[in-house]
């Protein structure tokens, strides 16, 4: 991978006009977003369906949109999936298609919706890629308008608001069940069929999520089954990597697996426990090919003074209402001084620690296997290329590095 630092000249102007921090301003300038684009990206229409108090309002809005055949933009923050019909599973699978700068789903002619998540409900559910049209229900088994809409509206929303919630899926956009979690055989078949459809479409990326059970159903049989699958996955480490490499191989030209997140059973929280978890948090699956190919990738240069936990959190919120979603443009930071002796993390990645006065600690995990820990020493000044995130467990700012240059 060849990294190219972009030239930015309007950062201060965008900061003042858009009222944003410098990291967001540089991202906005690089992407060429207008103020209208930025507002659409920063203020998506979404409801947290885990909050039952606003669930009825959200349900009514969606029903009204379907009844009037008007367009409605929705970001679904969390939902359970295992009760959905087989056709709804296919529906969720096909919705992994990723457009140039956003997810785009619509029932009419191709429009430029701008950045953000767009789920458009109308009289026919389909996704378009240029001149190609792919129905959300392969085979046309559900052509009736009301039935097709009910796949999302009735099955999904009724499940969200129901009393039988057992599994939750954290959705950055919309994903599908991992094949390793308990699924009926028929759903497994359709899942494979859906992945094949995505391969034919040659979309740029796949988003993939798995399930985690709610705490209060500790004795539920399906949860016990999930725990067994979860433990086997973590202990062997093979299922996660096999699925990641399988998805990554679907389109060798451009496609990269963006993330694969397993829930932590019994906690009600979402944890990245797979061996590739931190690469996934970085915004893309960093494979060996990622380091060795000769593609050129833009990099946004940041100053050390740009960094703060608040700035990074706001930046991640802009990328998606859930902190993930839009592909992250790598950033570069020059002049960081290694604060402590380098160490290896649990997954044998090199970990560098930095400390910035009035800001706090910054962890850096190096995902490029070409680096050796003996190259780095406490007190060295370095330049880093990678992506920004916030560690869910330590709350520290984190740089997921793919290139580290020693400056002295």
Which functions belong to the PLM regions below?
Residues 64, 70-71, 185, 189, ...:
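Mid-to-C-terminal polyanion-binding domains and interfaces
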């Amino acid at each position: 991978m060849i990294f190219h630092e972009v030239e930015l000249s309007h950062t201060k102007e965008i900061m003042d006009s858009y009222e944003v921090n410098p990291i967001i301003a540089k991202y906005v300038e690089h992407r060429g977003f207008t103020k209208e684009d930025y507002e659409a990206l920063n203020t998506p229409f979404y409801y947290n369906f885990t909050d039952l108090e606003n669930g009825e309002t959200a349900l009514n809005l969606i029903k009204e949109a379907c009844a009037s055949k008007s367009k409605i933009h929705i970001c679904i923050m969390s939902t359970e999936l295992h009760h959905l019909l087989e056709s709804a599973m296919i529906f969720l699978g096909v919705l992994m298609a990723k457009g140039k700068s956003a997810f785009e789903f619509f029932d009419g002619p191709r429009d430029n919706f701008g950045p953000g998540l767009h789920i458009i409900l109308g009289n026919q559910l389909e996704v378009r890629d240029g001149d190609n049209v792919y129905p959300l229900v392969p085979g046309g088994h559900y052509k009736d308008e009301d039935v097709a809409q009910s796949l999302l509206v009735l099955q999904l929303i009724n499940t969200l608001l129901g009393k039988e919630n057992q599994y939750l899926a954290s959705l950055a956009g919309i994903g599908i069940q991992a094949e390793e979690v308990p699924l009926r055989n028929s759903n497994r078949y359709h899942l494979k069929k859906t992945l094949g459809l995505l391969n034919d479409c040659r979309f740029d990326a796949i988003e993939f999520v798995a399930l985690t059970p709610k705490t209060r159903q500790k004795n539920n049989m399906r949860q016990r089954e999930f725990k067994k699958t979860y433990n086997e996955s973590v202990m062997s480490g093979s299922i996660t990597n096999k699925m990641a490499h399988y998805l990554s191989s679907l389109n060798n030209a451009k496609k990269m697996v963006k993330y694969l997140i397993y829930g932590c059973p019994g906690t009600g929280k979402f944890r990245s426990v797979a061996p590739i978890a931190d690469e996934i948090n970085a915004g893309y699956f960093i494979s060996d090919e990622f380091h060795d190919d000769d593609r050129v990738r833009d990099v946004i240069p940041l100053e050390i003074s740009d960094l703060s936990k608040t700035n990074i959190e706001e930046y991640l919120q802009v990328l998606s209402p859930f902190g993930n979603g839009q592909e992250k443009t790598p950033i570069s930071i020059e002049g960081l001084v290694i604060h402590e002796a380098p160490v290896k993390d649990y997954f044998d990645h090199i970990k560098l620690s930095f400390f910035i006065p009035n800001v706090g600690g910054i962890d850096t995990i190096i995902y490029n296997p070409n680096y050796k820990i003996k190259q780095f020493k406490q007190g060295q000044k370095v330049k880093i290329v990678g992506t920004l995130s916030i560690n869910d467990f330590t709350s520290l700012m984190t740089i997921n590095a793919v290139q580290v240059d020693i400056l002295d």
